[in-house]
Swiss-Prot record:
Annotated Gene Ontology cellular component terms: fungal-type cell wall; membrane
Organism: Saccharomyces cerevisiae (strain ATCC 204508 / S288c)
GO MF assignments: structural constituent of cell wall
PROSITE patterns: SRP1_TIP1
Membrane topology type: Single-pass membrane protein
Keyword Transmembrane helix appears in the UniProt entry: yes
Protein name: Seripauperin-3
Amino acid sequence: MVKLTSIAAGVAAIAAGIAAAPATTTLSPSDERVNLVELGVYVSDIRAHLAQYYLFQAAHPTETYPVEIAEAVFNYGDFTTMLTGIPAEQVTRVITGVPWYSTRLRPAISSALSKDGIYTAIPK
């Protein structure tokens, strides 16, 4: 015979698991919340691989980056407010413009969006 307390504990555990699951939201890839997650991953990647980015920039001197990204890389505080307002097409251009986008950045961005319960949909 199962004790009522065991059933109650099981129900409580299931309820806690449901409550802990992040809410999901589907957004346009150009939504500023998506851009901020992408830029956060990008800034973290630059910090972790700074020499590689310097070499890439030296080899591609015409590639320009928004000044806000450079400020965020070297400001180790909360940089998300610095990155608001960068146009979505500029975010896409700088992030996808590096050779390691598909091998390193895209998986990290997908993971970060998923962790935040954000999924993207291409607008019709």
